[in-house]
Design a protein with these regions (language model features):
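Catalytic core of soluble alpha/beta enzymes
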Residues: 185-311
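Catalytic domains of carbohydrate-active enzymes, especially glycoside hydrolases
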Residues: 167-182
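Active-site mouth loops of central-metabolism enzymes
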Residues: 104, 145-165, 183, 212-217, ...
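Structured beta-strand/loop patches that form or line metal/cofactor-binding pockets in enzymes
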Residues: 1-59
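N-terminal small/glycine-rich loop or linker at the start of catalytic domains
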Residues: 131-159, 194, 201-203, 256
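Metal- or metallocofactor-binding catalytic centers and their adjacent structured scaffolds
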Residues: 39-125
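N-terminal amphipathic alpha-helix/helix-capping segment at the start of soluble metabolic enzymes
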Residues: 1-8, 19-23, 93-102, 124, ...
Length: 311
C-alpha cells in the first residue's frame, strides 16, 4: 500500500460576497487529491480535501514543501502498524519534518488541506465514513447526528434588507433552526437595521448568530456589545483579532450572552492560550476551530485533548 501521487489545483471562489474583512471575488481555494494504489469496488481510492474559504489556496507551499515529503518517504513508514491502512498521524509527522514550531501562518492551511485528503483516503480504504472511523479509534460509539447552522448574511452589491430576509427564510425552509449573518462591514446603525430585519423575519422559528470576522478594536467591540445585548442572539462571533485574548476577555464584561471564537486559531497551543487568557465562559461560549485551516484533523484531535484538560 502506498501513496502514488499528491495533486493540487488552485481555483477562484469567484463570488461577489464580502464580510467585514474579505472580498471573496479575490479569494482562491486549494483542491487536493491524494492518489493511492488501493482499489475498492473496482475503483482506485483517492482522498480529496480543500481548504475553507477565508484563507487563500496554498498550491505553492504544497508543491514546494509538503507534497515531496510525502512522496519521498518510505511507503511503509506512512502506514499503521498492521500495514492495513494509511496512518494520518505518521504522514502528518513526515509533512512537518524540518519545520520550526510556532509562526503558523499559511503553513497550517497547506498541511490542513493535505491532512483532510489523507483522512478521506484512510476512511475510504477502511470502508466506512470518517466519523465512524474516528469513533472506533477512540473506542466510542459513533453519533450520526451533529449540530449545524446556516452561515450566510454576507454583504452583497445591491443587497437590501428584504433580500437578506429572503435569504434567511430560505435557510429556514431547508430545515435550519440557527442562522448566521455578518456584521462589521457597515455602520453600527445599518447593522442594527439588518439584525432587526432578520429577527422580524425568523420570529420564533430560529435563532440568529452574528459574526464580525475579527474586525473590531476594543472600543468598537464594546459599542457593538452594548447594541447586540438588546437582542436574543445565539452568539456574538469573532469580535476582534483572534490572537488578542485580552480583548476577548474584556468584551465578556459588556456582553452577557454567548460569544464564539477560534476559527482563526491554528494550533492546540493557540487554543490553550485562548482558554487561559480569553475569558471564555464554559457555560455559554462556543469554540470554533477549523480543521482544514489548522493543520488538519491530526492537530484538531490534539486541540480536543487540550479542551478536555481544561474541562
Amino acid at each position: 500500500m502506498r501513496i502514488l501521487d499528491v495533486v493540487e489545483t488552485t481555483k477562484p471562489i469567484s463570488s461577489p460576497i464580502r464580510n467585514a474583512y474579505i472580498d471573496f471575488s479575490k479569494m482562491t481555494s486549494s483542491l487536493v487529491a491524494v492518489v493511492t494504489d488501493v482499489v475498492r469496488d473496482g475503483r482506485r481510492v483517492v482522498g480529496y480535501g480543500f481548504n475553507s474559504n477565508g484563507r487563500y489556496g496554498q498550491g505553492g507551499l504544497i508543491r514546494e514543501r509538503f507534497r515531496d515529503r510525502i512522496l519521498e518517504a518510505e511507503p511503509a513508514s506512512l502506514l499503521n502498524d498492521e500495514g492495513s491502512n494509511l496512518d494520518p498521524h505518521r504522514i502528518w509527522a513526515k509533512m512537518m519534518s524540518n519545520e520550526k514550531p510556532g509562526g503558523h501562518g499559511e503553513r497550517s492551511v497547506a498541511v490542513g488541506t493535505l491532512d483532510m485528503a489523507i483522512w478521506d483516503a484512510a476512511a475510504k480504504i477502511g470502508g466506512k465514513p470518517l466519523f465512524r472511523l474516528l469513533a472506533e479509534m477512540k473506542g466510542k460509539e459513533a453519533n450520526p447526528r451533529v449540530f449545524v447552522y446556516a452561515a450566510g448574511g454576507y454583504y452583497y452589491p445591491g443587497k437590501d434588507n428584504s433580500a437578506l430576509q429572503a435569504e434567511m427564510r430560505g435557510y429556514l425552509n431547508r430545515g435550519y433552526n440557527v442562522v448566521k449573518m455578518k456584521i462589521g462591514g457597515a455602520s453600527i446603525g445599518e447593522d442594527r437595521g439588518r439584525i432587526e430585519a432578520v429577527l422580524k423575519e425568523i420570529g420564533s422559528d430560529a435563532k440568529l448568530a452574528v459574526d464580525a470576522n475579527g474586525r473590531f478594536d476594543l472600543e468598537t467591540g464594546i459599542a457593538y456589545a452594548k447594541m447586540l445585548r438588546e437582542y436574543p442572539l445565539f452568539w456574538y462571533e469573532e469580535i476582534g483579532d483572534p490572537l488578542d485574548y485580552a480583548l476577548q476577555a474584556a468584551i465578556a464584561e459588556f456582553y452577557p450572552g454567548p460569544m464564539a471564537t477560534g476559527e482563526n486559531l491554528f494550533s492546540h497551543q493557540d487554543a490553550r492560550n485562548l482558554l487561559r487568557y480569553g475569558g471564555m465562559r464554559p457555560d455559554r461560549d462556543w469554540l470554533q476551530f477549523d480543521c482544514a485551516l489548522s493543520y488538519g484533523l491530526v492537530e484538531y484531535l490534539r486541540t480536543l485533548d487540550v479542551l478536555a484538560q481544561h474541562g
